[in-house]
Regions:
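Multi-pass alpha-helical transmembrane bundle typical of ion/small-solute transporters
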Residues: 1-211
């Protein structure tokens, strides 16, 4: 904006069912957490109805199933977040003249995938504690449901080319499990409020720093 003015920005929107440009990105970022929350709430209601008469031994099966849903969520996370990083690096390489097409070099893809993996493992524990413990008390079944909802929304977003925030989707999915269990009062809404504040301030802060 500062360099070339608003007319040089591709604002976009929704074209052929896909979010494009700045407005499309903002729409995807706004809608994806809502879908995560609704998906988790509906899944929780469905699972509770199906397992109403299940034995308590189902806990072991649920925990084992989380190996699959955790892997699915990790894949969905990488499929979306790594693409965003690759896009930025490719844009820089194009501007520098290092490459001449939008096809990303393999070394860029590997470097970005490695960076996302290392960053998640090394620097994500504070966020993990907030999502896993501070929003609402989670049971194994809640974890399974929230992972399923989060992975589904994240992967669907990647398929349609929508850049979203996996952490936002996971946070809202965790809230959705609390709502689906009929325990909205037990959701720590002050923590949710702080997360929402971070969401709202992150984008303008990043834009100001870039400017």
């Amino acid at each position: 904006l500062l360099d070339a003015g608003a007319s040089a920005v591709y604002w976009g929107g929704i074209e052929d069912g896909r979010p494009v440009g700045v407005l499309g990105t903002l729409i995807a970022l706004a809608v994806s957490p809502i879908l995560g929350l609704l998906g988790a709430a509906l899944l929780t209601l469905l699972v509770r109805r199906l397992l109403r008469r299940a034995s308590v031994r189902i806990e072991g099966t649920v925990r084992s199933s989380q190996w699959f849903t955790s892997g699915w969520l990790a894949f969905s996370h990488g499929a979306n977040d790594a693409q965003k990083t690759v896009g930025i690096v490719v844009a820089l390489l194009l501007a520098h003249g290092t490459i001449s097409t939008l096809a990303s070099p393999v070394w860029v893809e590997l470097a970005c995938a490695t960076a996302v993996t290392v960053g998640t493992v090394v620097g994500g524990w504070t966020i993990v504690k907030t999502i896993g413990r501070r929003i609402v008390k989670l049971r194994a079944l809640d974890g399974l449901v929230s992972q399923t909802s989060s992975a589904g929304v994240s992967l669907a977003s990647s398929i349609v080319g929508a850049p979203v925030s996996t952490s936002q989707i996971v946070s809202s999915s965790v809230v959705g499990t609390g709502v689906g269990r009929g325990r909205a009062k037990r959701v720590r809404w002050h923590v949710v409020g702080k997360i929402l504040l971070a969401w709202v301030t992150t984008l303008p802060a990043a834009a100001l720093i870039a400017a």
